[in-house]
């Protein structure tokens, strides 16, 4: 193995963030990137280590990564993530948390490099095959993928695990061994420890053949993307929702392809065939007066105004009141709803000295809003403003004392309207 085995054609960016677990694969990747940096002094290289908290050795792994990065003069970011049960299983949840941390750490103009190799590609293909995936799932991993507004690069994807190990031994590299990698209760470990050695004993080039099949599946998906581009344009709204009316006249196969691509655009997990059928039958075709909802992990698919919505699940806050004693500073909202702040300049009056300020999520009685005659109940206002049902008890309502002043981004009440130029605006950062 030589330095040329790193697919440097991918490294057009000169700012690289390398995912570094401290294991064999990521150690070889980081070593090769360090050598690449030596030949290209304009390259800026950082590493990121994710502390999942799953192993009793996690702290020693952090120290190992710090030592390696210090020796190679690579700035290291250590991110500690908290894993909670979200119904996806520990492997999937750890991966989700890991990539969320990657996305949050990337700097402008920086690309992410990860250490997946040919054997990983084979495992990913077989896991997709086990799930009954179609060409999209069987495409496995690409060497270059869009990620968090930049790129995710896999410059070792053409190399085998054996080749990486030979490189590491030849160059005297040290790496950690995660004890969980020997637990064949995990599907990927079962393939790596039991199934693939047997297959390679019979067919030594099995991983390379699988990689070729994955490439062919990816090419078919790209062709379908081109052919369905105009359909997607017709179906997807500026808000990212999916119009149902164009789908009604499509064949089952074409409609399923559109649904899959829409979900991919929303960064949703690849749905199974059964899941697509449930989306169509239970959500899209639910009766007109229903508010159908189908859960997928910590997200939901809902229907509103003849459109499908992919949204994050948030518990209703109907009974919640959040005091805002220092209204001049931003206020954190519960349930991950973000923050609100009152900024100078706007159509809301400032609170009077004797008025307490709070955020609530319900308002009783008849409300009089700016631009409308007569009083209306809040439910009627939500309907008139086209606010989906699931946003109605999660949209912040600003109160001064017991007086409703405004709904963030939706309306201002007459009692809350500014009478002079010294008004404020309610800004919601969801």
Curated annotation (Swiss-Prot):
SMART domains: TilS_C. It comes from the Bacteria. It catalyses: cytidine(34) in tRNA(Ile2) + L-lysine + ATP = lysidine(34) in tRNA(Ile2) + AMP + diphosphate + H(+). One of its GO terms (molecular function) is tRNA(Ile)-lysidine synthase activity. The keyword Ligase applies. It is an enzyme of class 6 (ligase). InterPro entries: Lysidine-tRNA-synth_C, Rossmann-like_a/b/a_fold, TilS/TtcA_N, tRNA_Ile_lys_synt, tRNA_Ile_lys_synt_N, tRNA_Ile_lys_synt_subst-bd. Its EC number is 6.3.4.19. GO terms for cellular component: cytoplasm. It is found in: Cytoplasm. Keywords: ATP-binding, Cytoplasm, Ligase, Nucleotide-binding, tRNA processing. ATP binds at residues 21-26. Its main location: cytoplasm. One of its GO terms (biological process) is tRNA modification. Ligates lysine onto the cytidine present at position 34 of the AUA codon-specific tRNA(Ile) that contains the anticodon CAU, in an ATP-dependent manner. Cytidine is converted to lysidine, thus changing the amino acid specificity of the tRNA from methionine to isoleucine. The N-terminal region contains the highly conserved SGGXDS motif, predicted to be a P-loop motif involved in ATP binding. Belongs to the tRNA(Ile)-lysidine synthase family. NCBIfam families: lysidine_TilS_C, lysidine_TilS_N, PRK10660.1. This is tRNA(Ile)-lysidine synthase. It comes from Salmonella dublin (strain CT_02021853).
